[in-house]
Amino acid sequence: IRSGRDADAYEPDRDGDELPQGRFLDRERSWLAFNERVLELAEDPATPILERANFLAIFASNLDEFFMVRVAGLKRRIATGVATRSASGLQPREVLDLIWTRSRELMARHAACYQQDIAPDLSDEGIQLIRWPDLTEKEQARLFTFFRQRVFPVLTPLAVDPAHPFPYISGLSLNLAVVVRNPVSGHRHFARVKVPPLLTRFLEASPQRYVPIEDIIAAHLEELFPGMEVLAHHMFRVTRNEDLEVEEDDAENLLQALEKELMRRRFGPPVRLEVEESIDPYVLDLLVRELKVSDAEVYPLPGPLELTGLFAIASLDRPELKFPKFIAGTHRDLAEVESASAPDIFAALRERDVLLHHPYDSFSTSVQAFLEQAAGDPDVLAIKQTLYRTSGDSPIVDALIDAAESGKQVLVLVEIKARFDEQANIKWARKLEEAGCHVVYGLVGLKTHCKLSLVVRQEGDTLRRYSHVGTGNYHPKTARLYEDLGLLTGDPQVGADLSDLFNRLSGYSRRETYRRLLVAPKSLRDGLIARINKEIAHHRAGRPAYVRFKVNSMVDEAIIDACCRAAQAGVPVDIWVRGICAIRPASRLSENIRVRSILGRFLEHSRVFSFGNGGEPEVWFGSADMMHRNLDRRIEALVRVTDPAHRAALSRLLETGMADTTASWHLGPDGNWTRHATDADGQPLRHVQEMLIEARRRRRATP
């Protein structure tokens, strides 16, 4: 494992050609560019209006997490003196300045998009997001009653004076800073009122007219401070360091000793203060002083703050204002055309492997049905399963409980530390244990991120293993919104690999090599680099050669260096990335590298790795992104695709995603992304997701 090395002081291997400086783009800048692409979808008038509201909420939620984790980590590195340059050559201080400048621009654009486009356009469709003064007297009277009955009892006004120290402001909470005056003494006082997070963010004043909850509280502050004059109130919101796990960057290993105390406290230091533009300088000064934030961390914005509340608006039942409804179909290899009975998935897998592409192929009639059938089948002896993120009421969890209760051996490998999901994960892990499942909590120091299921079944005199290897979590809800791949197979090699890997995860196996899997942290990075290098040899020998990756993030320096070497040697390298990309394309050092990004109604989540291999293409897919944490500190698995039809389908997918006729963003050598949504004649380019939806619809229409 390379994790002992300092990731920020990455030294390339000194074999072969010297690679030029400047081949890495800054990862934080690249992440902000990714969130800008989300914002562009919200700004695009061609996106349905409720989906635009949804993208505004996604942008806000993404940025919250970015500040809580990445910005907090940078500040921590600066404060503790672990300030090595990043791979892009910038000092942490320079990166922080860049983030502050860029995020300020993006947050201003985000607020303007809401004020100038989204709110007025929603109003045109009869969904009015209004402020307290815009309400009718009747609406105000109704909301006053609501305030008295449902809001007032849960509010806690906290005074600030010599007897009452400044209260602790929890991360991401909405707060009112209130200035009151005592009419007797004439003294001004400051108080803080927290907006209860469990109350609905936008309340319906009358049908299709919504008002932010903080407006209702602000309009009735006299109720909270009887006998006092309310002089002013201002909204503010604090973002804190809440990255509970020390991960993400190898540099942070040095910090663990220094950080133990801090990490034990849930309350990290503030990293951002959002305030309304109209805030009184006296109040702002007090907040800045008490919260100990710098001027650069203060973000004045037009209200309302905290637009993640738009998720609720986006989920209103107005289908005509959303993307056209799409219902996933059952994969044709699993569909029982003849009968209405549930298909026998094991019988189907004895005939052939099934390549699933969610959400176009239904999760519930494939992966979920596979596990449910296994749970109810008397011939199934054992089920082994990894769970990284799932929902507590998940049918997957129910199936595993049923299996354990009917006497089957059930091993569940649970990853408790899926960030920000810890509570939920602990809950259903207990539920599984109580039912008699063997629950294992991963390997020390390694997160289990691979997506695997293994079913062992008695068939005559032999035991047969059936497997599922995927790119996405076993989470039926996200399976409808995330684009993911999965392989259901009865192949004995994959079955043997999964048996070995599960033994490694639950016991003391030291196996490092597998038949059809590449497994991190040992063989995955080296396996991919060896294959990239092999493409150079194929190219020099005049055989077909290419490298095509589809990933969520492309940051790992060793993988990037291998790609740059291949590109320098003349091998075409195509990278289809959703989020961060630190590889600099199409410059004189890498003219053979093309980078594209696609965002849309589904979150592109699958990871695919394809190699020309001298005319015999090799294709892998699985759970791993090209990041340190995935390759060094997580158990990840990629599976080799052996069925020629499956290889061809995945190659077609990658070609379509990279094609100039497909709508996408293109990364330039300067690190800037440009959106390509129309052709030279101004006609809209096709979106890969729309093409796949269309293909599924056509397939269903043909008998």
From Swiss-Prot:
E.C. code: 2.7.4.1
PTM entry text: An intermediate of this reaction is the autophosphorylated ppk in which a phosphate is covalently linked to a histidine residue through a N-P bond.
Keyword Metal-binding: yes
Positions that bind ATP: 62, 482, 578, 605
Active site: 449
Native species: Streptomyces griseus
Descriptive protein name: Polyphosphate kinase
Protein family: Belongs to the polyphosphate kinase 1 (PPK1) family.
MF terms in GO: ATP binding; metal ion binding; polyphosphate kinase activity
Function description: Catalyzes the reversible transfer of the terminal phosphate of ATP to form a long-chain polyphosphate (polyP).
Reactions that this protein is recorded to catalyse: [phosphate](n) + ATP = [phosphate](n+1) + ADP
Compositionally skewed regions (Basic and acidic residues) per UniProt: 1-13
GO CC terms in record: polyphosphate kinase complex
Gene it is expressed from: ppk
Region ranges (Disordered): 1-21
Keywords, sorted A to Z: ATP-binding, Kinase, Magnesium, Metal-binding, Nucleotide-binding, Phosphoprotein, Transferase
Residues that bind Mg(2+): 389, 419
